[in-house]
């Protein structure tokens, strides 16, 4: 086992604070509408340019191991805030730095670290309750667009695109961000349920100009098995031959069964198309059941004793329209029962709560979106690849922020909400004087985001902070236009969830750092190669002497 380097008390805390400051100082320059960019060197390709706090934090590793421990603990604050709300990482870092700095000053002055932490925790619990009281719902197009604009670094186009996407696919719909091919940002909305499976034969195509298949009011047959012989295929075909079009979604359709479908289509006897079921294994079974719920059909599966030969028209589902191309199938306006669809969505949401892997959670959320609304894709446009990556990261942040705003509402932005909360809990007291100091540490930290926004805008932080504190309600300072006024009326909003998460995670990690008394790390390894080289050199000299003797 490697030897360890151990530091105690003030020596440990000073080193830790130095690491905290290096990381926080790099991150906090990005805060606010006039925050600056940070350029990150990459081992290959062009440097990355970002204004995203967590991206900057993740890049930082310090040479001194004790300092690095401090930096890594604050990095955890940014990562946790990002995971919980998708934004507010810089705010969380600024709050953590302030709590750690003021807290360690109090520890150095002889305060009890555990009571300080209890005081900080007490203040944060009270602050979170006050934040909930200040929060207002965010549901209309304008408010959603404003939240998106603020989070995307005052880019109004991005804010409007996100609001438009939410309006079209609903708040539960999936909105993804992709790199576009042009200079302009675009919004592409897929209504209905779409999955990544195309037609099994190009002979089904009935729209040669677009290379796609369009079926109006088709019946839909779902089969959890491979279909390969005519005997299985004929009953459903005969059922719909006179009634209309047919879409078959099965594990696979091959051999003579596929040939029969192609011949019937080409002769115009029945308009039919076949696609493979989406997903694999258990996920395929679940997605077939989703489609069944959406279209009012029954999945023909031998596991539940249903056979294709005995399929009747009652087992088939129905949709207003189906569009199939070589890569995707889109089912529009299925006739499934509304309450059954809602029940299915509730069931999948429960699975999301219980899911342990991010991949499973993401796939389940996609299924909810396909059942509940649709899918929107925001295609980000830019002139260069470097700009594209930076802009895409900003749009993703803005999307997370708007989702958080819809979930828990919004508060006045620009650090004003935390200033108002600090004012409301200023009379809070602890069980002893040390806890009171902890409460004051937390209250002072709540001013730090506003102060940093003002510093980044090149103004005097103390003057503006005092002016904002003297005001009431949503009165604050717009660093972008350099004006005072009602922040909500000026469209400067922060999602309540983002502000809450930033405060809670900052206090949690900072509280642990305040109560640190000892730090342990591996001793740096001595350069043993120099020693071995020296030894070899000595032997060489000896051998030379022996040669002389001979």
UniProtKB/Swiss-Prot annotation:
Coiled coil: none annotated. Its EC number is 5.6.1.7. It is found in: Cytoplasm. GO terms for cellular component: cytoplasm. Pfam families: Cpn60_TCP1 (PF00118). Disulfide bonds: none annotated. It comes from the Bacteria. Keywords: ATP-binding, Chaperone, Cytoplasm, Isomerase, Nucleotide-binding. GO terms for biological process: protein refolding. NCBIfam families: GroEL, PRK00013.1, PRK12849.1, PRK12850.1, PRK12851.1. Together with its co-chaperonin GroES, plays an essential role in assisting protein folding. The GroEL-GroES system forms a nano-cage that allows encapsulation of the non-native substrate proteins and provides a physical environment optimized to promote and accelerate protein folding. PANTHER family: 60 KDA HEAT SHOCK PROTEIN, MITOCHONDRIAL. Belongs to the chaperonin (HSP60) family. This is Chaperonin GroEL. It comes from Buchnera aphidicola subsp. Thelaxes suberi.
């Amino acid at each position: 086992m490697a030897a360890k380097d151990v530091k105690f008390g003030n020596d440990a805390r000073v080193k830790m604070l130095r690491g905290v400051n290096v990381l926080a100082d790099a991150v906090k320059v990005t805060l606010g509408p006039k925050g600056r960019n940070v350029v990150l060197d990459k081992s290959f390709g062009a440097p990355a340019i970002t204004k995203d706090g967590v991206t900057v934090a993740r890049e930082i590793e310090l040479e001194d191991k004790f300092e690095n421990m401090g930096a890594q603990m604050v990095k955890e604050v940014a990562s946790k805030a990002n995971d919980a709300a998708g934004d507010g990482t810089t705010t969380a870092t600024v709050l953590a730095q302030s709590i750690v700095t003021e807290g360690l000053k109090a520890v150095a002055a002889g305060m009890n670290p555990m009571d300080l932490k209890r005081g900080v925790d007490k203040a944060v619990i009270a602050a979170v309750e006050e934040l909930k009281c200040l929060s207002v719902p965010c549901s209309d197009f304008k408010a959603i667009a404003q939240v998106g604009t603020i989070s995307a670094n005052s880019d109004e186009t991005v804010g409007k695109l996100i609001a438009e996407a939410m309006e079209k696919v609903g708040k539960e719909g999936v909105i993804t961000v992709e790199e576009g091919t042009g200079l302009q940002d675009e919004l592409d909305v897929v209504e209905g349920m779409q999955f990544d499976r195309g037609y099994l034969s190009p002979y089904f195509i009935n729209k040669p100009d677009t290379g796609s298949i369009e079926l109006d009011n088709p019946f839909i047959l779902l089969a959890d098995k491979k279909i390969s012989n005519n005997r299985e295929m004929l009953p459903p075909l005969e059922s719909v031959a006179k009634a209309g079009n047919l879409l078959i979604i099965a594990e696979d359709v091959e051999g003579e069964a596929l040939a029969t479908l192609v011949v019937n289509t080409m002769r115009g006897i029945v308009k039919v198309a076949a696609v493979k079921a989406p997903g694999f294994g258990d996920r395929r079974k679940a997605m077939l059941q989703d489609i069944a719920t959406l279209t009012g059909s029954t999945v023909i599966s031998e596991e539940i004793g249903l056979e294709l030969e005995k399929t009747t028209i009652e087992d088939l589902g129905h949709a207003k329209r189906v569009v199939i191309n070589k890569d995707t199938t889109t089912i529009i306006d299925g006739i499934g029962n509304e309450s059954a669809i809602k029940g299915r969505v509730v069931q999948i949401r429960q699975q999301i709560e219980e899911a342990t892997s991010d991949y499973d959670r993401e796939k389940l959320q996609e299924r909810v979106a396909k059942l509940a609304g649709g899918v929107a894709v925001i295609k980000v446009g830019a002139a260069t690849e470097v700009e594209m990556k930076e802009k895409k990261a900003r749009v993703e942040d803005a999307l997370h922020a708007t989702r958080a705003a819809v979930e828990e509402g919004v508060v006045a932005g620009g650090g004003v909400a935390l200033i108002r909360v600090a004012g409301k809990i200023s009379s809070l007291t602890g069980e002893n004087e040390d806890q009171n100091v902890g409460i004051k540490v937390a209250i002072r930290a709540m001013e730090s985001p506003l102060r940093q926004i003002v510093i980044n805008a090149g103004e005097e932080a103390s003057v503006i902070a005092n002016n904002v504190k003297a005001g009431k309600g949503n009165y604050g300072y717009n660093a972008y236009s350099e004006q005072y006024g009602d922040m909500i009326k000026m469209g400067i909003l922060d999602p309540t969830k983002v502000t809450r998460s930033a405060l809670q995670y900052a206090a949690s990690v900072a509280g642990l750092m305040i109560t640190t008394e000892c730090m342990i790390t591996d001793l740096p390894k001595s350069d043993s190669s120099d020693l071995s080289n020296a030894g070899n050199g000595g032997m060489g000299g000896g051998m030379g002497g022996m040669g002389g003797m001979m």
